[in-house]
Structure formats: structure tokens, C-alpha cells
Amino acid sequence: YITTYLSGLMSGQVDSAAHARARIVADQGRPALGSPQFKDMYNKVRRIPVPKGGGLLDRSDLWGIDGSYNLSEYTKSFADVIVGGNWRKYLLDSDSTLFPDPVDKPIGITEFGAYVQITKELNSWLKLSASGRYDKNENFKGRFTPRITAVIKAKENNNFRLSYQTAYRFPSTQQQWIDLDLFSYKLIGGNKSFVSKYHFDTNPAYYRDSLQNGVVKQWDYPLQKPESLTSFEVGYRGLLLDQKLMIDAYGYWGFYQDFTGRISVIQSKSGSGIPDLNTDQVYSVPINYHDNINTNGFGIGVDYRLPRNFSVSANFSSDNLDVPAGLTANFNTPKYRLNLGVANSSFGKDKRAGFAINYRWQDGFYFEGDLANGDLPAFQTLDAQVSYKFPKTKSILKLGATNLLNEYYYNAIGNSYVGGLYYISFGYNLY
């Protein structure tokens, strides 16, 4: 192209003519778009694995139906009753770049569930709510999870709440089916099909930690299970000081069973024997941790109404998960978070103007992901908004910013930086 283009310019051709001639020469032998030759080359390029410079192709779909129905009209003499259910169909379609799905043959996963919730006021100071839910994933046994909550009215506008909850989580689509070569290691799912694909039955893998500490332990590719959680929560919400002060506080304790995390195992490239830590094949694999893992946290929020429609607010929360060494938990929640705010929804001569300012801070923590790990630094942002009402049309004009000072931060390892977002909005017939 360059030789023909420069030759054309030197012979007196205008730029467009020289470019057209050079393009004709350069495109000789180039397959036409949509031709069999083009499709063949396209398919070869898109199947190049990530370590060799290729990319990911993910055209997966999720189809779902959710519904609920309030039966209280028919059951109010006994209690308030709500029933509901859902159905989901996952179609994993990556042409073998992310999942082990053959070309044009997506991997299907079907889930469905149903629930019933019953709420009853036993007397003027006690309300009970109980619910039960059943869910089924085609790759796992069905799960039933009950919950019960009590709301105790201590006095007017002052309530305590107690709850006992059970929950579950089926392994995600990637935890089941991911199959990604990242050059330094392979990231795979927990589906049993990987046993034969990577010959773990004839060429076993070994825990990386066991090879490092000299106590060699074989990894047996255990059956993948849903993780379950049992939790208890206590809370209080009330209005104090002539209903100017609102306090909302809670604390919780949870106990995970079969917690899903990731570990590293190593397999010999020679096909047998104890693998070498530095030269043999490393896999990141999902496991269910056999011991209970505990989580706990608390939070408190305070809102106070000042004269002339001013208000101030603050909330602080903490979340903690006790993770054993060597287990990648992907908890990815900061231990501490803080929000402070001041606002006024109507001030000025006609009480049409308003504003809100919010300060947000988040503690730093060690981020764990399937593709990258690392220290995530703490960050803080300032959000602000001003508004003006137009009573005749029941409209509001708003001008505001999220991260007003444009302090760049990122909230996950590998994510792009987030800067300021500035906006203007107009709402019509809102009040």
C-alpha cells in the first residue's frame, strides 16, 4: 500500500486517487466480506486462545419468568398470604472461548423455584412472618429454605425485630462451567465433565499448598454442592425526640456450610507422578469448604430533622467474613463504610428550592476475583444536587453530580476508573 501510494503522489496524482490505487493493490487476494474464505479465516482467528492473543466471545442468554400473587383477600380472616415462583433458563454460548461449549451448541442450565409467605398480627405488639421456599437447579438436588421474623412493638413508633433465616446459593454458571486458559494457570468449573477432559482420573492433581509445605495431598475433584447460610439478626427502628430523630440499627451473625471458594491444584504435564511447583500445570478450581465459615456485621443509621426543613443523616456499617488461609472466598466487601449527608427539600421564598449533599467513604480491602486479585484502596466521593419545583405543572428541575470533585477510583481489580457523573433532569407531573 505505502509503495503504491507514495508512487502515485510523486507522479502527480491527488491524494484520493493515490489512496484508491494503493487500496486496490493492497486488497489483492483479500477475501470478500461474507465469502467462504472470509468465514474460514474469521473462525480461525476467533478461536485463538487468550494466552496466544485471542479474545473472549460470550453470547450467553438468560431467559426468565417471575410472578407473585397476594391471596390476602381470601385469607385475611386467618393471615396475609403471598405466593410466587420463578423459572430461569441459562444458555452459555462462547464458542469454547469461555465455556467448553461446542460451536452453535450452547450449554443449557434450567432453574425453577416457588415460595409462600404468611404474615399475621397476633396482638397489638407482636407480628410474625414465616416463609418457605423450594428451588431446583437441574445440576443439583432441590433445596428448601424456611425463614421466620418477629416484629415487636415496644411503644408507638419504636419497634424491635428478630429473624432467623436460611438461604442457599447454587454455584454460578462460571463456577460450574468456566474453562479459561490464562497462560499461568487454567480457570475451570466444578462440573464433573472436567474430570475426563483434563484426565484427573488417570493423572491426578495435588493441592498446591501441600506441595509447598512438603505434605503431599491428592485432590480428588469432590462433588460440587450449593452453599447454604443460616443467619440470625436483631434490629431496632424508632422515632425519638418528638419524632425528629430516627434511628435504625441492626446486627447479624451468619454461618456458612459448604462455602464455595477457589483453591489452586497442580497436575503433572508428563501424565504421571508428583507435579513440580514451578513447571507443571496449575488449575484454579472451585471447592466447598468442609468446615463452617462465620460472618457477622452491624450497622446504624441516624436521621435528624432540623428547623426550616433541613435534615442531617449518617450511617455506618461493618461486615466481616472469617476466611481460612489458602481459600479464595471472593467475599469482596469492605469491612467499614460510612455515609454522611445534609439536605433541604424546600427552602426559599416559595419553598421551591432544594439541595442535597452526601459524602461516601469505603474502607480498602483485598479483592479476590476469578481473573485478578489485589489490594483495593479506600476511596471517598462527594455527591451533590440542587433542585427547583414548578408547582403549576407539578414538575421538578434537578442539577447534580455523582463524585462531584471527579476523584477517580476503581471498585474492583481489573475494572476501569470511575470519575464524576454530571446530570440535569426534568420531571413532569410528579406530585
Where are these regions (language model features)?
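Residues that define the transmembrane beta-barrel architecture of outer-membrane proteins
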Residues: 59-63, 108-112, 142-144, 228-232, ...
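Repeated loop/turn-to-beta-strand initiation elements of outer-membrane beta-barrel proteins
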Residues: 75-81, 125-128, 157-160, 242-247, ...
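Conserved C-terminal beta-signal and adjacent last beta-strands/turns
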Residues: 313, 329-431
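Transmembrane beta-strands of outer-membrane beta-barrel pores
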Residues: 87-93, 112, 132-138, 166-170, ...
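Residues on the lipid-exposed face of transmembrane beta-strands in outer-membrane beta-barrel proteins
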Residues: 65-71, 114-120, 148-154, 234-238, ...
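Membrane-embedded beta-barrel scaffold of Gram-negative outer-membrane proteins
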Residues: 1, 193-282
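Face-selective signature of the C-terminal outer-membrane beta-barrel domain
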Residues: 1-99, 104-140, 248
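Gram-negative outer-membrane beta-barrel transporters
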Residues: 124, 247-260, 265-366, 427
